Regions:
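Short beta-strand to alpha-helix junction loop
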Residues: 34-37, 64-73, 113-136, 142, ...
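A short, glycine/Asx- and small/polar-enriched loop/turn
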Residues: 69-72, 103-109, 151-158, 296-300, ...
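Glycine-rich FAD pyrophosphate-binding loop
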Residues: 1-17
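Helical element adjacent to the flavin cofactor pocket in flavoenzyme catalytic cores
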Residues: 113-170, 178
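Flavin-dependent oxidoreductases
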Residues: 24, 46, 150-262, 269-282
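Dinucleotide-binding Rossmann-like beta1-alpha1 core, especially the glycine-rich loop
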Residues: 21-100, 222-227, 232-233, 261
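C-terminal catalytic lobe of FAD-dependent flavoproteins
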Residues: 123, 222, 258-310
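Short Gly/Ser/Thr- and Asp/Glu-enriched loop/turn motifs at secondary-structure junctions
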Residues: 57-61, 195-196, 289-291
Length: 310
C-alpha cells in the first residue's frame, strides 16, 4: 500500500489511449509468455475489484505461418507452451483456421496456432481499472504531476516534482514515451526509442454482420499484420517493416493525446499483404486511421529489473 504513481498529464496519456488493445500469450521468450498469461488471468479480477468495465473480449487468437521456418517456430512455441503449463492452445491446419476466421484467405499458409486466452480489451478502461483497484488497496496516484529530477540518497531517492518532493526507497521507471528522460535523471541510458505505429479501422463488413460469433484476434506472420473485430468492421494493425523513429531522446513533455498523419506510402507493402489476406477489406472503406507513438526496446520486450548501483 505504500506506493504512489506520478502521471505528468492524465491517465492513458502518451500511448495507452490509442493502443489497439490486443492481448495474447505468444512470445519468443517463454518467460514473457508466462508473464503475459498471468496478466490475462488477472484481468477479470482487476475488473471485478475496481468495478470498472475493461471491455474484455476473449475471442481466442490465431497466429499463422506461411514459410517452413516460421511454421517450425510456431510448432516449437507450441511445445514450449505445453512445458510451461499453457495448455489451452493447439496447432491448426489452414482449413481449420479458415473456419475460425471466415474472412481470412489461407493462400500460402502452412498452418497456425490457436490459443483460447487471446482477444482484446478497452485500453482506457483497463488503465482506470488498475488505478481504481490500486487505490482501493491503499496505493495512490497523482495526475498533472511532472517529475523534474531524481536525487539518490543513502536511503533511497528524492523525487523532485513540480508539486513538491517525495522521498522513497525505490523508483520504478514506467515513463513510456518519456522513459529515456526519466532514465537520464537517474544517470542511466536506456536502450528505448519511440516508434510510429499504424492501424486502421474499417467500415462495416457484410460477412461479419452474418456471423453469430466474433472473429478471433489473428496475427499473420508473413504479412506483418494483426487483425481483430471492431463492432461489425475490423481493426488491421501493421508491424512496420520500414519503421520510423520519433523523438529519439524522448517525447516532448507537452505531448499527450496527439496522433500523426497516416503514412500510407511507408506501409504500402504491408497494406497490400493485409488486404490480400483479408479480401473483404477491398470492398469497404476505411473509417479511421491511427498513427501513434509507442516506446520499444531493441527486442520488443519490456526492460524489467533492477539497475545495478541504483
Amino acid at each position: 500500500s505504500d506506493v504512489c504513481m506520478l502521471e505528468r498529464s492524465v491517465l492513458t496519456a502518451g500511448s495507452s489511449w490509442h493502443a489497439a488493445g490486443g492481448i495474447h500469450t505468444l512470445n519468443a521468450d517463454p518467460n514473457m509468455s508466462a508473464l503475459q498469461a498471468y496478466t490475462i488471468e488477472l484481468l477479470p479480477e482487476i475488473e471485478a475489484e475496481s468495478g470498472q468495465d475493461i471491455g474484455l473480449h476473449m475471442t481466442g487468437g490465431l497466429t499463422m505461418a506461411g514459410t517452413p521456418d516460421r511454421w517450425e517456430w510456431l510448432q516449437s512455441a507450441y511445445r514450449v507452451y505445453q512445458s510451461i503449463g499453457i495448455s489451452d492452445c493447439r496447432l491448426v491446419t489452414p482449413d481449420e483456421a479458415r473456419e475460425l476466421n471466415p474472412i481470412m484467405s489461407t493462400d500460402g499458409l502452412l498452418g497456425g496456432m490457436w490459443a483460447d486466452r487471446e482477444g482484446y480489451l478497452d485500453t482506457t478502461g483497463t488503465v482506470h481499472a488498475y488505478a481504481k483497484a490500486a487505490r482501493k488497496r491503499g496505493a495512490e496516484y497523482y495526475e498533472h504531476t511532472k517529475v523534474e529530477a531524481l536525487e539518490q540518497t543513502k536511503d533511497g531517492w528524492r523525487v523532485i516534482t513540480d508539486k513538491g518532493v517525495i522521498t522513497c526507497e525505490h523508483v520504478v521507471n514506467a515513463g513510456g514515451l518519456w522513459a529515456k528522460q526519466i532514465g537520464r535523471m537517474a544517470g542511466i541510458e536506456l536502450p528505448v526509442s519511440p516508434l510510429k505505429h499504424h492501424y486502421l479501422i474499417s467500415d462495416t463488413i457484410a460477412e461479419l454482420e452474418n456471423l453469430d460469433f466474433e472473429i478471433p484476434m489473428t496475427v499473420d506472420l508473413e504479412g506483418f499484420t494483426y487483425l481483430r473485430q471492431d463492432q461489425k468492421g475490423v481493426l488491421l494493425g501493421i508491424y512496420e517493416i520500414n519503421h520510423e523513429h520519433w523523438a529519439m531522446d524522448g517525447a516532448p513533455w507537452d505531448y499527450g493525446m496527439e496522433l500523426f498523419q497516416e503514412q500510407t506510402d511507408r506501409i504500402e507493402n504491408e497494406l497490400v499483404m493485409g488486404f490480400e489476406r483479408y479480401p473483404a477489406l477491398q470492398d469497404v472503406g476505411i473509417k479511421t486511421w491511427v498513427n501513434g507513438a509507442f516506446t520499444f526496446s531493441p527486442d520488443g520486450n519490456p526492460l524489467v529489473g533492477p539497475v545495478p548501483g541504483k
